[in-house]
Amino acid sequence: MGIAVSGVIFDPPKDFDVSILNRAFALSLEKIEGKVYLLTNPKFDPRNKGDFIVHRGDRHICIMNSGVADDLLFTNDLTSYHVLSREFPAVDRMIFFCLYDSGGSYGYSAFADGELIRSKLYAVHEGHVESGIPLPAEGKWQPAILTAQEIIDEDFEDGDERRFFRHVTTGRLAPDTLVNSCIVDELLRAEYGWSPFDDDHPSKNEYYRAAEAERLPVSSEPAKTLGRQPEASSIRSFLRRWFR
């Protein structure tokens, strides 16, 4: 079973309430209680721009919704960041991310103190697109030379041009098409103690759906970035905030 979600995660502000999302994104979200979200019609899916999952943790708030994250990641539209920064002025760090197994797109954009410090995205048709100074989590994955046994295990054939990365601590292998997924997972765990890959805390999920007139169909999980990536800040001092 794969994963298909995008969103934004940040330090938990005081008095967070869904009414803030309604105001920020001009919506009328209604809470879906308990497991009833599994029975909704149409099916609940955070790739729908009207379906939101909010995960609350001791160290984070994560808002999962394609309308919040995808435009920023795929079309360089920073509206969501500016809107959330206005609503949460005390929050100085945010990470927007996407983990789309079905569309083959993985990546993130990290902000600190009002600046985009790093953007890293892999999309099927565009390949790797990145800007800014790599975060320490990326340095844990280095280009790998496969052993003879690994070549067999990965079913390499003549002319195979796949590239692999190896985790410097665990030795885990990841193809270049999936390494961003691994980096997002590690980055969020290190910074916020949680990742969307976790499924052992469903009770911390809250499910919301917009009024019918505000819903849009499931996003197509954009497979191609459009335009130029936004310029990342070159101020290295911002990076000291990550993995202190």
Q: Language-model segments: what does each one mean?
A:
Residues 1-31, 242-244:
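Short, extreme N-terminal segment that most often corresponds to the first beta-strand
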Residues 3, 9, 20, 32, ...:
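Weak global preference for isoleucine
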Residues 4, 60, 107, 240-243:
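Broad hydrophobic/π-residue packing in well-ordered secondary structure
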Residues 5-8, 18, 36, 54, ...:
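Extended aliphatic helical segments
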Residues 12-18, 71-73, 160:
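Alpha-helix capping and helix-coil boundary motifs
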Residues 20, 79-83, 234, 238:
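Exposed alpha-helical structural elements
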Residues 27-121:
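Short, intrinsically disordered low-complexity segments
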Residues 98, 113, 118-244:
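Long, compositionally biased intrinsically disordered terminal regions
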